[in-house]
Amino acid sequence: MSLDDPVVITCSISGVIANREQCPAIPYTPEEYGAEARRAVEEGASMIHIHARKPDGTPSYEIEDFSAITEAIRGAVDDVIVNYSTGTIGVPVAKRVEYLRACRPEVAALNMGSMNYAKYSRSRKDFVFQMVFSNPFEEIVELLKAMNELGIKPEHECFDVGHVGSLEPLMDMGVLKAPLHVDCVMGVVGGIPPTPRNLAAMVDNILDIPTEGANPGGVGGGRGHHWGVIGISRDQWTLIAAALTLGGSIRAGVEDNLYLPDGTMARSNGDLIAQARRMTEDVGRRPATVAEARGLLGIA
């Protein structure tokens, strides 16, 4: 990747932790997902990252909910890359593979390691929530094999430098092929602190991964793997600025952060994607079209 490449802007459309009491823009029903996807795509998003919910807002891992949401999104926009979450606590791998097999998204997230996962409140001097996010290698490999069988591109979500280091052994095993699509997730307590220097360190490690055969025919062909940043909470905007100047892609949406840089709560995912697009253009880059995004990700 380079500064000459267009920017893949992903919209994290819903998440499963926040709710409408915190932000009215969070979609619950398939129709609301479709409307939010349309707003995001109109502002420059080329990929939509989905956590499924039931119409009452409850997180769901059921085929019918993923299917209904995906159908609503595809009915609302001409074209967009659909990306499913597979990150859960307490949901068996087989259950996650079921909805991947039934719905066949182009991309699916794959968390690259286990960690403490928490949110800390300085005012309370305590954790708002804390959990162990378990992603052992045996589960990573099982999900990778399923994605390979189904023709789904894995999005490797790395919460620390050590997670990046877990990629090369999987390539050596033959279950992971170049070009890689890697996102640096920053801002979760228990993961790497959300600073531009730490992002640069993660990117250096990504770029050290062998790229033989990576992306020979796509946009940016021959320049290696695709990477981006996922900034959690209000550090998101600083990290987006850093990623754009380092040549990476970006993600925004109500899953990650509810607020614009001035502290105003977003009225929709479209507000957040519009801000991300303006920042992209302000550094002399441009949003990727959906076709260009597929090329950069190696799924064209």
Regions found by a protein language model. Name each.
Residues 59-84, 143, 202-210, 222, ...:
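Alpha-helix-loop-beta-strand connector modules within alpha/beta enzyme cores
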Residues 15-32, 86-93, 129-134, 191, ...:
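Active-site mouth loops of central-metabolism enzymes
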Residues 1-25, 114-127:
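N-terminal small/glycine-rich loop or linker at the start of catalytic domains
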Residues 21, 47-66, 185-186, 190, ...:
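Glycine-rich, proline-tolerant flexible connector loops at the mouths of alpha/beta enzymes
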Residues 60-134:
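Active-site beta->alpha loop and helix N-cap motifs at the rims of alpha/beta catalytic domains
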Residues 107-254:
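Catalytic alpha/beta core domains of metabolic enzymes, predominantly
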Residues 33, 40, 51, 108, ...:
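Conserved, mostly hydrophobic/aromatic
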Residues 120-122, 261-281:
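C-terminal helical cap(s) of enzyme catalytic domains, especially alpha/beta-barrels
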